[in-house]
Amino acid sequence: RTNIGEPLGQIYGYKAIGLYQTQEQLDNRPFVGNGVQRFGDIMYEDINGDGKITQDGDRVKIGHSTLPELNYSLSMDFNWKGFNLSALWQGAAIVSYTLNGTYSHGSMDNTVYTRPFYSGGNAPYYLVEDSWTPENVNARYPRLSAIHNGNNAYTSSWWLVNGNFLRLKNLQFGYTIPKKILAKANIGLSNVRVYVAGTNLFTFTEFKYCDPEMAIINNGYYPQQKNYSCLLYTSPSPR
């Protein structure tokens, strides 16, 4: 959803106010119109007070845009007696994303991050460990359901994630053999350098189960991979 005067990619959704814990809460809930609400389901605030939860009347701005307001990077390079250490950090700030995806005009969609066995996939460990049960009423996540649960699939502040991150994008450590040693060794080489390198080594972010650089939750994005390499660079002596 894009509105005049609002940031491109601003997230709109329902304001979650907790999980249903008592029969009184269920008896006095506003009409949601998607599924049957049970204990452990997400409660939404009736913003306009009409007794119904609707897109036109109750969706509000939640979080920040899905496009970072701030992108930053830091490049470092250290040299000492033939040794070299270089690093590239990059990150983003003032950005949000939701775990429930963006199908159905951004209003609702379960994903592998919000429902176990979604589309025949696996069940995230964190959902199983910290979902609502009668013995775990202070859970971080709503009750589990192996089938579609429309009430818990809505875009809402419940599934909002802080998208800020800092990533060690590239790290390289190497050593260049001094030319006088190569000349003395008389091995026909004028330059020898060996180094090890890695990419995407560390990421500091609030929600560790997603790649914070992904374009969208349910768009088939394959997370960036860690890579390690060890290289030897040589150049022959001039004739």
Kindly give the residue locations of the regions a language model identified:
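Outer-envelope beta-barrel architecture signal
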Residues: L70, K81-F83, N164, G188-V192, ...
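Membrane-embedded beta-strand positions in outer-membrane beta-barrel channels/transporters
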Residues: S73-S75, N170-G174, S229-L231
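Transmembrane beta-strands of outer-membrane beta-barrel pores
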Residues: W80-G82, G91-V95, N170, I177, ...
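Conserved small-residue
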Residues: R1-H64, F117-N136
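Repeated loop/turn-to-beta-strand initiation elements of outer-membrane beta-barrel proteins
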Residues: G82-S86, K180-I181
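Extracytoplasmic gating/loop element in the C-terminal half of outer-membrane beta-barrel translocons
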Residues: E6, Q10, A92-R193
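Membrane-embedded beta-strand positions of outer-membrane beta-barrel proteins
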Residues: A87, V194-V196, L232
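Conserved small/polar residues in nucleotide/adenosyl-binding loops
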Residues: Y233-R239
